[in-house]
Swiss-Prot record:
Distribution of this protein across tissues and organs: Synthesized by the fat body and is eventually secreted into the hemolymph.
Protein purpose: Sarcotoxin II is an antibacterial protein which plays a role in the inflammatory response of this insect. The main effect of sarcotoxin II on E.coli may be the inhibition of cell wall synthesis, including septum formation.
Species assigned in the record: Sarcophaga peregrina (Flesh fly)
GO biological process per UniProt: defense response to bacterium; innate immune response
Induction: In response to injury of the body wall of the larvae.
UniProt keyword terms in alphabetical order: Amidation, Antibiotic, Antimicrobial, Immunity, Innate immunity, Pyrrolidone carboxylic acid, Repeat, Secreted, Signal
Protein name: Sarcotoxin-2A
Length: 294
């Protein structure tokens, strides 16, 4: 009961906060220097974990390393729990430009190490629409086990000014194959407020023979000052229905806009099925800072 009251209070604070507040082709030329000084961006977040402790994540990324044609990608990160256990750490390097991008990520903890390769392409279709394609593959090695999990993902999305649609496939080798289709629409938008709606369907086929579908929808509201609320309902065929709510708020933003502190809260409850009335809550804080050099 106390946790529910605490969650309700967090959501009330967030809700109150939200109410109160696009080059022609040329012959190769020497690569010009960066048009803006490089930026070191620091991100830190803390979130509750239903199994105990607080999940802490830290990320340091370097941006504006290239020029208006090509932008390198570089970041390091670490994630862990205050109760102890294995700490996930890794790094990402890549490059992007002219609507194309590619990156690799290496991560490891005390049990396994993973290597992820990703590529994406963004094709502009006029002034307000684009076609976005992404593919990725993650290979994992687990200490002491011969089985090497591999996760492959691919997606294609058409994004317009107010409408969007996507289809994706995730294959977890030896475990499952998931096909997801979704549609989104902007219901309302002005200088300060934005309201989006989305619906989706996922067909999950598991190697053990247990197959099921997930269908659902969500409403997502956001305010220009950095506040937002969302609510969704998901139906798991043969299992039950689950409702989710969440919100976030910008608690602090520096005058120069380089530093910000955000809070988020969320909760879910099973409405039917074998998990009926089971609830889960979360609360988190996120700190971001961009340090200009040069």
């Amino acid at each position: 009961m106390k946790s529910f009251v605490f969650f309700a209070a967090c959501m009330a604070i967030i809700a109150l906060s939200s109410l109160v507040q696009a080059y022609p082709q040329k012959l190769p030329v020497p690569i010009p220097p960066p048009t803006n000084p490089p930026v070191a961006a620091f991100h830190n977040s803390v979130a509750t974990n239903s199994k105990g402790g607080q999940d802490v994540s830290v990320k340091l990324a370097a941006t504006n390393l290239g020029n208006k044609h090509v932008q390198p990608i570089a970041e390091v990160f670490a994630e862990g729990n205050t109760k102890g256990g294995n700490v996930l750490r890794g790094a990402t390097v890549g490059v992007q430009g002219h609507g194309l991008g590619a990156s690799v990520t290496k991560s490891q903890d005390g049990i396994a190490e993973s290597f992820r390769k990703q590529a994406e392409a963004n094709l502009r279709l006029g002034d307000s629409a684009s076609l976005i394609g992404k593919v990725s593959q993650t290979d994992t090695k687990i200490k002491g086990i011969d089985f090497k999990p591999q996760l492959s993902s691919s997606s294609l999305a058409l994004q317009g000014d107010r409408l969007g649609a996507s289809i994706s496939r995730d294959v977890n080798r030896g475990v499952s194959d998931t096909l997801t289709k979704s549609v989104s629409a902007n219901l309302f938008r002005n200088d300060n407020h934005n309201l989006d709606a989305s619906v989706f369907r996922s067909d999950v086929r598991q190697n053990n023979g247990f197959n099921f579908q997930k269908t659902g929808g969500m409403l997502d509201y956001s305010h220009a000052n950095g506040h937002g609320l969302n609510a969704g309902l998901t139906r798991f065929s043969g299992i039950g229905n689950q409702a989710t709510v969440g919100g976030y708020s910008t608690l602090f933003r520096s005058n120069d806009g380089l530093t910000s502190l955000k809070a988020n809260a969320g909760g879910s409850q099973w409405l039917s099925g074998p998990f009926a009335n089971q609830r889960d809550y979360s609360f988190g804080l996120g700190l971001s800072h961009n340090a200009w050099r040069g």
